[in-house]
C-alpha cells in the first residue's frame, strides 16, 4: 500500500515555488500509483497554532504525480474560502499530503471511529430534495475534539444544509468511511531537504532568496 511521504510534500512545495517562478517543476522522487489524495496548506506565525490556508483534493483515485501537482496549486490558489497564497507567505507554510485508502460503506452515520476514519456523507434535504455531500479527513474530528454526532452535524453544515439538524436528518445520511496516511512538512524542513539533496541553499523567488523574508 502506498503511504504519504516526505517526497510527496517536497513535490508540492516544488510545484508552488515553480509556479511563482514560472518554471518547470523538478521531477518527483516518489513512485507513481493511483489513489484519492488531498493537499493541505497551513500557515504558522510566531510559533502559534497552524491556521488553515487551503485544503482541496479528490475522493476519486487518480495518478499521484499529476494529482499532487494539480492539487498543490488548487489548494494554495483556488480554495474559495481563502485568498490565494502569496510567495511572501512561503516561509510560514506547512504542507500536509494525504493518501486515502480503505473505503467502506458504513452501517449508519455512527459506524466509524474518531481519529481513525475519514468520513464522506451524502444525503438529500428533506425540505427541497437537494442532494448534499461533504467529507472530513480523519484528523479533523480528532483535532477539533468532536464527538461523532458533533462531527456529523458540522459536516452537514459544511455540505450546505441550513435547516434544523434532527435525528431524522442524520438518519438520511449515507456514510462512507475511509482511512488515510499523511505527512506534514514545514517550509524550513523543505529548505533543509533541498540543501541536502540538491546542494542548493534555498529556492529563489523573483530573484530573492527566501531566507530574506520575515
Curated annotation (Swiss-Prot):
Domain AMMECR1 as annotated: residue spans = 1-194
Pfam families attached to this UniProt entry:
AMMECR1
Superkingdom: Eukaryota
Cite the InterPro entries for this sequence.
AMMECR1, AMMECR1_dom_sf, AMMECR1_domain, AMMECR1_N
PANTHER family to which the protein is assigned, alphabetical: AMME SYNDROME CANDIDATE GENE 1 PROTEIN, AMMECR1 HOMOLOG
What is the protein named? Answer: Uncharacterized protein At2g38710
Amino acid at each position: 500500500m502506498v503511504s504519504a511521504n516526505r517526497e510527496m510534500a517536497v513535490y508540492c512545495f516544488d510545484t508552488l515555488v515553480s509556479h511563482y517562478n514560472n518554471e518547470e517543476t523538478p521531477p518527483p522522487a516518489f513512485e507513481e500509483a493511483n489513489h484519492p489524495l488531498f493537499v493541505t496548506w497551513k500557515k504558522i506565525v510566531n510559533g502559534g497554532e497552524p491556521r488553515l490556508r487551503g485544503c482541496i483534493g479528490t475522493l476519486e483515485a487518480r495518478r499521484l504525480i499529476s494529482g499532487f501537482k494539480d492539487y498543490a496549486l488548487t489548494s494554495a490558489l483556488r480554495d474559495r474560502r481563502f485568498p490565494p497564497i502569496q510567495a511572501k507567505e512561503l516561509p510560514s507554510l506547512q504542507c500536509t499530503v494525504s493518501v486515502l485508502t480503505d473505503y467502506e460503506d458504513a452501517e449508519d452515520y455512527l459506524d466509524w471511529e474518531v481519529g481513525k476514519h475519514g468520513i464522506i456523507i451524502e444525503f438529500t434535504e428533506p425540505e427541497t430534495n437537494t442532494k448534499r455531500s461533504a467529507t472530513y479527513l480523519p484528523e479533523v474530528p480528532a483535532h477539533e475534539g468532536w464527538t461523532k454526532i458533533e462531527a456529523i452535524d458540522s459536516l452537514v453544515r459544511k455540505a450546505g444544509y441550513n435547516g434544523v439538524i434532527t435525528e431524522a436528518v442524520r438518519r438520511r445520511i449515507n456514510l462512507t468511511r475511509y482511512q488515510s496516511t499523511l505527512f506534514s512538512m514545514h517550509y524550513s524542513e523543505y529548505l533543509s531537504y533541498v540543501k541536502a539533496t540538491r546542494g542548493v541553499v534555498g529556492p529563489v523567488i523573483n530573484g530573492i532568496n527566501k531566507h530574506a523574508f520575515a
